[in-house]
């Protein structure tokens, strides 16, 4: 019984001395998908790829735009953002013909991924519509990241 008590005390001490688990936001390319609500001129919700590159606290991203079930738009949504600790903020735009939108997404990193939420505010022929988007991005495991050149 004394042995069990000592073992539990030792385990508790080791756990208390360990570092807290926090996300390690590394300079890397994070890939994932965003699901956005239906627009008045689309038939369904849209699930599209997003790629976010983080370098020294700055972010830039590309997000695929699809207005129909088959064709991807020639121009992708593009934007920039910031990483502050475990938080990420992204802002971008897209335009094609008379349609355009402004996007804002934000989220938090947990381990090697981040969950994103935000909105796209569309303008089409003088009408405005806002839709919600949510998704996630994830970086490769650390051993698979490009190595720094020395």
Could you say what each language-model-derived stretch is?
Residues 1-9:
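Bacterial N-terminal signal peptides that target proteins for export
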Residues 9-17:
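Hydrophobic helical h-region of N-terminal Sec-dependent signal peptides
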Residues 19-23:
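Sec/Tat signal peptide C-region and signal peptidase I cleavage site
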Residues 24-111, 117-150:
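Central antiparallel beta-sheet cores of small beta-barrel/beta-sandwich binding domains
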């Amino acid at each position: 019984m004394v042995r069990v008590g000592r073992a539990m005390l030792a385990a508790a001490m080791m756990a208390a001395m360990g570092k807290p688990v926090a996300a390690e936001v590394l300079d890397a390319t994070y890939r994932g998908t965003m699901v956005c609500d239906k627009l008045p001129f689309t038939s369904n919700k849209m699930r599209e790829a997003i790629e976010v590159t983080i370098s020294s606290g700055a972010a830039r991203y590309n997000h695929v735009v699809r207005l129909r079930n088959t064709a991807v738009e020639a121009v992708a949504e593009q934007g920039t953002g910031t990483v502050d600790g475990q938080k990420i903020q992204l802002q971008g735009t897209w335009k094609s013909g008379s349609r355009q939108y402004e996007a804002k997404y934000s989220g938090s990193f947990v381990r090697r991924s981040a969950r994103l939420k935000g909105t796209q505010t569309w303008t089409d022929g003088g009408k405005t519509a806002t839709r919600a988007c949510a998704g996630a991005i994830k970086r490769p495991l650390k051993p698979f990241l490009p190595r720094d050149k020395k």
